[in-house]
Swiss-Prot record:
Role, per record: One of the primary rRNA binding proteins, it binds directly to 16S rRNA where it nucleates assembly of the head domain of the 30S subunit. Is located at the subunit interface close to the decoding center, probably blocks exit of the E-site tRNA.
Keywords for this protein: Ribonucleoprotein, Ribosomal protein, RNA-binding, rRNA-binding, tRNA-binding
CDD domains associated with the record: uS7_Bacteria (cd14869)
Assembly, per entry: Part of the 30S ribosomal subunit. Contacts proteins S9 and S11.
A Pfam family assignment: Ribosomal_S7
One of the GO BP terms on file: translation
Name under which the protein is recorded: Small ribosomal subunit protein uS7
Position of the signal peptide: none
A single GO cellular-component term on record: small ribosomal subunit
């Protein structure tokens, strides 16, 4: 960690099609080996499929899916006197978004559909309806935090 000054977070350019910073971040998370145009095709294809299936606006379903996957609390390991405790801590807003997007992409990659766009679209549709692997992951994280509530006083 720097001692002199806190370095601000780099500003991300909004995506060209929907002018959304969240979507631009999502494209970056989907991207593999620096192939951004391929990642954009996948994400935009998934959004089109999603809008077709749900009949709602592209971004509205995406936002709703993200909202349902965002974790409020997580556990961090804290070593106290020879034993390690899982201490529940609140998640900062930026990390909340990052975790939600990462979990959604990971869940989509594990699905069985043919193309990545289809997998992503179906995972986002499931997440917008509060079901699916990504939502289950969030529930597991919340359950862990709830189970370790007794160690909340070890927070730093």
């Amino acid at each position: 960690m720097p001692r002199r000054r806190v370095i601000g977070q780099r500003k991300i350019l909004p995506d060209p099609k929907f002018k959304s910073e969240l979507l631009a971040k999502f494209v970056n998370i989907v991207m593999v080996d620096g192939k951004k145009s391929t990642a954009e095709k996948i994400v935009y294809g998934a959004l089109d499929l999603m809008a077709e299936k749900s009949g709602k606006d592209h971004l509205a379903v995406f936002e709703e899916a993200l909202e349902n996957v965002r974790p409020a609390v997580e556990v961090k390991s804290r070593r106290v006197g020879g034993s390690t405790y899982q201490v529940p801590v609140e998640v900062r807003p930026v990390r909340r978004n990052a975790l939600a997007m990462r979990w959604m992409v990971e869940a989509a990659r594990k699905r069985g559909e043919k193309s990545m766009a289809q997998r992503l679209a179906n995972e986002m549709l499931d997440a917008s309806e509060n079901k699916g692997t990504a939502v289950k992951k969030r529930e597991d994280v919340h359950r862990m935090a709830d189970a370790n509530k007794a160690f909340a006083h070890y927070r730093w």
